[in-house]
Amino acid sequence: MLAKVLSSAVLGIDAYVVEVEVDITMGLPAFATVGLPDGAVRESKDRVKSAIKNSGYRFPPHRITVNLAPADRKKEGAGFDLPMAVGILAATGLVNREKLERYLLIGELSLDGKVKPTRGALPMALAARNDGFAGIIVPEGNSRESAVVQGVNVLAASHLAQVVEFFNDTCELPPTTVSIQDLFSRDARYDIDFNEVKGQEHVKRALEISAAGGHNILMVGPPGSGKTMLAQRLPTILPGLTFEEALETTKVYSIMGLMGERAVVATRPFRSPHHTISDAGLIGGGQVPKPGEVSLAHNGVLFLDEMPEFRKNVLEVLRQPMEDGKVTIARAATSITYPSRFMAVAA
């Protein structure tokens, strides 16, 4: 009994399609996951088993093998729970396979079968649109973020049983839609404003010139003179984000799980890392590469408060991202490029 469900994984700030192949054969009960899964993916077998049982379905007491293709790329995160569960039910004949190849599925499962939000929903929705899928099934918590992508049906699911009934044509999942114009008009607001600064005319003039030309700026002054306050208000006088800029910035925040309740990042980011930050924390890195502060400040402002306190090697690694507007992290298996076009403000 073999079934194939389509899902997606993130590489850099973009996503690619992953084929979740489920094979159920006779033998002693076992659950094996292959295709370079990380710890969260390997642990999904226990979540999937409990979710299927607690949703009212029978978990097959046989040998189950799950392959995540392409098998030469590292798969991470809990977003494969939902496609694995649907694949197991499809292999046992409990899910109609006719519509499976037309939809991407992503989502983490709780033990009671509820579908929980996952990281990277926006780039995955873009991958679904670019590869010509009819739609993508996402957790309810990711639906508004994914619906920012035009040209693909975004279907929100709150429970595994809903997804099963959708593929069996006994339940409809209504598409989620959002108005980009309304999102920008509501969310493109700052809690602080540049006009709150009284006095400091020469500094304000320098910041206005810096904002107009996209120039980096260094502020020097005694403690308490307002350097940090002025830097925090600099994004409020920068031009508003275009939709393309907002989409690119949102992709970075989406894969880091920093979206919260927002559907899109509609304001210029402001990042102020502590002076004890490492070079990997600043430009990105790690065993499984992740974006750093320079990428989280993409299309916004990176503020280096107490710049002399930063370690020399940390300041040195800023040179290439500032010059190129991107940072490339090379590992033995792959090379990943993150965007890092920002205004640097130091004090």
What are these model-derived regions, one by one?
Residues 315-336:
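Conserved catalytic/switch belt of AAA+ P-loop NTPases
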Residues 171-209, 213, 240-295:
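P-loop NTPase nucleotide-binding/switch module
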Residues 1-218, 222-228, 330:
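Peripheral, non-AAA+ core regions of ATP-driven protein-machinery
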Residues 218-262, 319, 324:
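Walker A/P-loop
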Residues 270-271, 290-299, 329-347:
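AAA+/SF3 P-loop NTPase mechanochemical coupling elements
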Residues 230, 234, 290-293, 306, ...:
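Helical "lid/switch" subdomain of P-loop NTPase nucleotide-binding domains
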Residues 299, 305-307, 317:
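Walker B catalytic acidic pair
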